[in-house]
Amino acid sequence: VKSSNYPLYGDMSSRVMKIIGEYSPVQEVYSIDESFIDLEKLPFNLMSHMQSLRQHVKNWTGIPVCVGVGSTKVLAKLANRIAKKYPRFDGVFDIDELPYERYCKLLQSVEVGDLWGVGRQSAKKLNRIGVHTSYDFYQSDVGVIETLLGVNGKRIHQELYGNSCIPMESIPPTRKQIVSSRSFGCDLKDFDELNQALTNLTRKAVNKLNNHKLSTTTITVFIYTNPHKKDKPCVHLSKTIGMTSAIQDQSQIIPLVSQILRLIYKPGYSFYKGGLVLGNLAKNYQQQDLFSMNQNSPSQIIECKKSNTIRSVNSKFNESIKYASELGNNKWLPRADFKSNRYTTSWGELLII
C-alpha cells in the first residue's frame, strides 16, 4: 500500500485531460479522473475514434482508461460502468446502440444508488417507496421523483430516456467556497503546532483563490479531536468571521486565520484534524466597501505587491519562501513512509532506468 502522492496524481491527471481534450472541441473536466466530451456532429466513427483516444492515453501516460458513449451524461456514465466491467467491449461501450429490451435488462442489474447523481441519502428515500433498481427508477412517475428528489432527480430520470438535461460545462462554474483541510500526522496539542499547520493550509487555499481570480468575504476555521478514540471526548471547534469588503491577499488572510484559531483553541485537547473554508467567493473586481478609509491605501498596495512577488517566487522555486508561522517541527505533516516518487514534478525524484 502506497502513501498519497498528490503532486504526481495531479500532474498525470492534467496530462490525461489534455489528451482527451484533443478528441473533441468541447470538454468538461469533471474530476481528477473523469471528463466529459461532446461527440455530437463529429465526422468520425465514434467507436474507432474513442479506441484511438484510449490508445493515445495509454501510449503517452501508461494509464488505462475506459470510455462510455451515450446521448446524455447519465447514460454516458452508465455506459462507462459497462465498459469497465466487461472486457469483451475492449474499454469502449455505446449504450445508445443497445436494443430496448437489453437496455431495460441493464437497468434492472444496476442498483438505483449506483446511478450517477443519485447519492446514498437519495437512494434510501427511493428504497422506502419500493425503488431499488435503476429500472424501477426509470419506470417511476416523474412527478413522484421530482417531489422526492427535487429538480435534480427529475433531470436524472429524464436523462435515462435520452433527454439531455444536464448541460456540458466547458467553463467551470464559479466556486462557492474553497476548503483546505488535513488529518494531521499525529495529534496536536500545542497552539504553535496547530498554527503551523493552518498557515500552510491557508496558503494553499489562497493560491487556489488567486488562481481562479476570486476573493472572499467569509473565513471559517475548524479543528477536531479524533472521534474514534472512545476514551477521550469528541470536540469540534469552529468559528466564522465576515469582512465588509472582499479580500484575496495572503498577507491579510493568514493573520486572520491565526486570530480565529486563537479564539477557538482550547488547551488540553489533542486535535487530529483542522482546516479552513474561504466562503462567499466573488470575482476580484467586486465593489469594495464605500465607507472604508483603507481601501487602495499605499500600505495595502505594497502588501499586495509583496504577496504577488512571494507567490511568483514560490511557484518557480518549490515554495521556498515561507511565513514565520509555517516554521516548526512539522509534526502535523501526514505520514508518507511509503510514498512513491514524484516522477514528473521533481528533478530529484526522476525515474532512473
Describe these PLM feature segments.
Residues 1-158, 297-353:
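Gly/Gly-Pro- and Ser/Thr-rich, intrinsically disordered tail segments characteristic of DNA damage-repair
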Residues 6, 42, 72, 226-228, ...:
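Generic structural motif
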Residues 71-74, 159-163, 215-226, 270-282, ...:
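A glycine-rich phosphate-binding loop feature that marks nucleotide/adenosyl-phosphate handling sites
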Residues 77-79, 231-233, 287-288:
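Short, well-ordered secondary-structure micro-motifs
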Residues 81-85, 223-227, 294:
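Short regulatory "switch" loops immediately downstream of catalytic or recognition motifs
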Residues 259-316:
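C-terminal hydrophobic structural anchor segments
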